[in-house]
Amino acid sequence: MITVENLSFTYRKSKRVVLHDFSLAFESGRVYGLLGKNGAGKSTLLYLMSGLLTPKGGKVMFHDTDVRRRLPVTLQDMFLVPEEFELPPVSLVSYIELNSSFYPRFSKEDMIKYLHYFEMDMDINLGSLSMGQKKKVFMSFALATNTSLLLMDEPTNGLDIPGKSQFRKFIASGMSDDKTIVISTHQVRDIDKVLDHVL
């Protein structure tokens, strides 16, 4: 599915080595948790896996293609939910119209279903939402793209206790045998019930 092969990464400014000769394989049909303190390299690994960062050495292979190539056929089958992001002040319907075409397997029906897990609906304007609400909408969109690889960086940050419970049900409902989900967290108890493996 996706393999990390002898990966090394160093931040240029600080010269801090984050990963050195790191290898790992992720299988389909599994939810993986990347557990570690802040600054341990969890986010860096997710960005390397998505091709948004370039390793000093080694490579990440997704469907037998190096993610550094950023090919459309690769990008349409992976989705990264960063810890911090901005959404435009437009209606959710407009946002979906603008962005769903990049993901051939996007399902509006799935989007509605996932929003319901968070007690939200389609008739909302993104500019009027709190950060926690924006996160719920963006995660719902991410899962509704039906990509085979979903990367999530600290997705429960900013969610209250009911929101974290909703998140666990949301992830469980979106899993399938051909999907791999990788979640970084420093609070494993928030998501331990949905994880197949903790790394």
Which stretches of residues belong to each language-model region?
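Helix-to-loop junction immediately C-terminal to a conserved catalytic motif
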Residues: 50
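Catalytic Walker B motif of ABC-type/P-loop ATPase nucleotide-binding domains
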Residues: 150-154, 159
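The feature captures the beta-strand-to-loop junction immediately N-terminal to the Walker
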Residues: 32-37
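Helical segment within the ABC ATPase nucleotide-binding domain
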Residues: 164-177
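Conserved ABC transporter NBD signature motif
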Residues: 58-69, 73-74
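A short, flexible loop at the N-terminus of ABC-type nucleotide-binding domains that lies
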Residues: 1-4, 8-21, 28
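ABC-family P-loop ATPase nucleotide-binding domains
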Residues: 80-137
